[in-house]
């Protein structure tokens, strides 16, 4: 018979009591009432907060957006096909955040910062909230450094500064993405980190942009965030905020960043879809009442930081698509009122062969002129004035049969100036090359040439100046001014190249 010793039993009980861990865990849970169309309605989750992440039984993550008296409306970050009615959901106590690091450069990722380029995982030790508050007034300083796009029409007449928000607006197929990608290509060697956010685009279009950037060596300083047209609305809505969080990471590390949102119309449509499915009351054009806040809180994150914070910057180029040139629609007017100016691309100009199809008359930059270098200011003022007068005269000349000599000369000059603004895609020009081009046009050196010869002459002039007068570039880049010496060099180069060009043309004719 086994004898039970009381002291042994009490010893075992004492050991067990010592090992007992009195950890009490409270989990905020709920039950799925209904699921479908990327939306789930949850009963319970009493303590959940707006914007909090919730986790479903089978692993899908969602964001609690509607906090109602009887249920919680959750948008799903995924298709949610495996979620079943009656399954449990738990609140995570976290809001959406993504990992951030230098390793993201040259990669293509989705809205959750997961790589989608098949080049393996991205290592990151830090993370950042997708929705961070924008810098306050004291944290900023006014824009004063230029961000060159490499496009003559923009850098001369609608200049952009580091930390500015400049809207690119126009109909479909007018070259909006081309303007944005050319700007990325022009940042090579400028120590600017670029983030390109593609929202609701065709996968083939995004692949084309990535290929262009890779071929030109621009991917090494670029991050592409892509959520294509077949992605869930929630991820299309989040993608711009993910891009902004990545750009902010570099901005707060005293770096300069450029972010392109292509395009915010698609993000607004994704948000409208989510809101209508959540049964939020629709407003103008069926968009929810807070669609302005959707874009303002995103674009306010672009800033030029104060010297105390290291003078980093984040320049935003949001793109908005219009329907047959209607700038007074809801989303275009909202974004125009948030940004510091807009570049308007016209379908008529595009079809007339003027590319980039920038309508200089209604495009503005509200703060960029403070960032323009002096040399560009010296030549660009005259260009804008002459083009404005030309546009007025051209409209008038359609009705007048006989025009006096002065008017004919002005029309001829205007046509040549319009010609010098044309540029091929993926061929950005340096500031020095732009100054040469504008100076040649506004000072009448192109008036003697046929319109068809203008671009050929300018290409040859830029090459001639680069080879034979390298000191011109040195003067401009060191002083940022078109000095008397630089102007003399330029005049000599134009004269020499013009003689050579006319001689070559004569030889070709014969």
UniProtKB/Swiss-Prot annotation:
User: What family does this chain come from, according to its entry?
Assistant: Belongs to the ATPase alpha/beta chains family.
Q: What binding partners and quaternary form does the record give?
A: F-type ATPases have 2 components, CF(1) - the catalytic core - and CF(0) - the membrane proton channel. CF(1) has five subunits: alpha(3), beta(3), gamma(1), delta(1), epsilon(1). CF(0) has four main subunits: a, b, b' and c.
Membrane topology classification? Peripheral membrane protein
Q: Which HAMAP family match?
A: ATP_synth_alpha_bact
What is the name of the gene encoding this protein?
Answer: atpA
Kindly list the positions annotated as binding ATP: 170-177
Record site feature (Required for activity), residues: 363
Which reactions fall under this protein's catalytic activity?
Answer: ATP + H2O + 4 H(+)(in) = ADP + phosphate + 5 H(+)(out)
The protein, known as: ATP synthase subunit alpha, chloroplastic
Q: Which UniProt keywords apply?
A: ATP synthesis, ATP-binding, CF(1), Chloroplast, Hydrogen ion transport, Ion transport, Membrane, Nucleotide-binding, Plastid, Thylakoid, Translocase, Transport
Q: What is this protein's function per UniProt?
A: Produces ATP from ADP in the presence of a proton gradient across the membrane. The alpha chain is a regulatory subunit.
What EC number(s) has UniProt assigned to this enzyme?
Answer: 7.1.2.2
What Gene Ontology molecular-function terms does this entry list?
ADP binding; ATP binding; proton-transporting ATP synthase activity, rotational mechanism
Name the domain of life. Answer: Eukaryota
Q: Which organism is it from?
A: Phaseolus vulgaris
Subcellular location(s): the record lists:
Plastid, Chloroplast thylakoid membrane
Q: Does the keyword Transport apply?
A: yes
Q: Fetch the InterPro entries from UniProt.
A: ATP_synth_asu-like_sf (IPR023366), ATP_synth_asu_C (IPR000793), ATP_synth_asu_C_sf (IPR038376), ATP_synth_F1_a_nt-bd_dom (IPR033732), ATP_synth_F1_asu (IPR005294), ATPase_a/bsu_AS (IPR020003), ATPase_F1/V1/A1_a/bsu_N (IPR004100), ATPase_F1/V1/A1_a/bsu_N_sf (IPR036121)
The answer to keyword Nucleotide-binding applying to this record is yes
């Amino acid at each position: 018979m086994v004898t039970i010793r009381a002291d042994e039993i009490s010893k075992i009980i004492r050991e067990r009591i010592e090992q007992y861990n009195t950890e009490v865990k409270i989990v905020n849970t709920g039950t799925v009432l209904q699921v479908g169309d990327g939306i789930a309605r949850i009963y319970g989750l009493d303590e959940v907060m707006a914007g909090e992440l919730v986790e479903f039984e089978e692993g899908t993550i969602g964001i609690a957006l509607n906090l109602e008296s009887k249920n919680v409306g959750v948008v799903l970050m995924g298709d949610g096909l495996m979620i079943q009615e009656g399954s449990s959901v738990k609140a995570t106590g976290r809001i959406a955040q993504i990992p951030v690091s230098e390793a993201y450069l040259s990669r293509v990722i989705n809205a959750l910062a997961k790589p989608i380029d098949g080049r393996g995982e991205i290592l990151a030790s830090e993370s950042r909230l997708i929705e961070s508050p924008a810098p306050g007034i004291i944290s900023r300083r006014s824009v004063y450094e230029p961000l060159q796009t490499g496009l003559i029409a923009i850098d001369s007449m609608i200049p952009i500064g580091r930390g500015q928000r400049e809207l690119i607006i126009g109909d479909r197929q007018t070259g909006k993405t081309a303007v944005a990608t050319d700007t990325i290509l022009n940042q090579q060697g400028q120590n600017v980190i670029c983030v390109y956010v593609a929202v609701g685009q065709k996968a083939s279009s995004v692949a084309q942009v990535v290929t262009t950037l890779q071929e030109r060596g621009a991917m090494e300083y670029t991050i592409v965030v892509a959520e294509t047209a077949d992605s869930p609305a929630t991820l299309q809505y989040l993608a711009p905020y993910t891009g902004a969080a990545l750009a902010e990471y570099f901005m707060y590390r005293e770096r300069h960043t450029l972010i392109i949102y292509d395009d915010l119309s698609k993000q607004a449509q994704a948000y409208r879809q989510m809101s209508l499915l959540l049964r939020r009351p629709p407003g103008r054009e069926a968009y929810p009442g807070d669609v302005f806040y959707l874009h303002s809180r995103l674009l306010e994150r672009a800033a030029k930081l104060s010297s105390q914070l290291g003078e980093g910057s984040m320049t935003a180029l949001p793109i908005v698509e219009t329907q047959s040139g209607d700038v007074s629609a809801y989303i275009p007017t909202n974004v125009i009122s948030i940004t510091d100016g807009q570049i308007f691309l016209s379908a008529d100009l595009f079809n007339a062969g003027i590319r980039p199809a920038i309508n200089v008359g209604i495009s503005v930059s509200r703060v960029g002129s403070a960032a323009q270098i002096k040399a560009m200011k010296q030549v660009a003022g005259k260009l804008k004035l002459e083009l404005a007068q030309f546009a007025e005269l051209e409209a008038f000349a359609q009705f007048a049969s006989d025009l006096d000599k002065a008017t004919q000369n002005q029309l001829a000059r205007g046509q040549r100036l319009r010609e010098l603004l044309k540029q091929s895609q993926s061929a950005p020009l340096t500031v020095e090359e732009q100054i040469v081009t504008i100076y040649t046009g506004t000072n009448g050196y192109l008036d003697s040439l046929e319109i068809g010869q203008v671009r050929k002459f300018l290409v040859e002039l830029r090459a001639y100046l680069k080879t034979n007068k390298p000191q011109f570039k040195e003067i401009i880049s060191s002083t940022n001014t078109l000095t008397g010496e630089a102007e003399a060099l330029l005049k000599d180069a134009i004269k020499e190249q013009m003689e050579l060009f006319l001689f070559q043309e004569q030889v070709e004719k014969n």
